[in-house]
């Protein structure tokens, strides 16, 4: 029987991911993940963060992308996630249209199209 928890201390998170705890600390310093903290400042990783770390591990180890590239890809993914709800058949309000335009401009700058 396997027991699943909602939050994992850094040692367990690292073990589950096949990574060293120091790697998780480095990713936190770079802003790739933001684990919550206990009152005693111990890191707690959610399942969502574990999935994000799995994706980072894949990008680094399997795709050969450096950490700067990973940061850029994750930023783009976050922008796309914010834009997706605006992509619907209904007409956009002027405010939504401005916001979408700003998000797209930011995305273009990030990928080097401006």
Name what the model sees in each region.
Residues 1-62:
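Basic helix-turn-helix/winged-helix DNA-binding cores
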Residues 32, 74-78, 88:
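Short amphipathic alpha-helical surface patches that mediate protein-protein
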Residues 38, 67-70, 91-94:
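Short, surface-exposed loop/turn segments at secondary-structure junctions
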Residues 51, 68, 95, 99:
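Charged, alpha-helix-enriched surfaces in structured cytosolic catalytic cores
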Residues 52-82:
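A short, Lys/Arg-enriched interface patch at domain edges and termini
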Residues 79-114:
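C-terminal regulatory/oligomerization modules of transcriptional regulators
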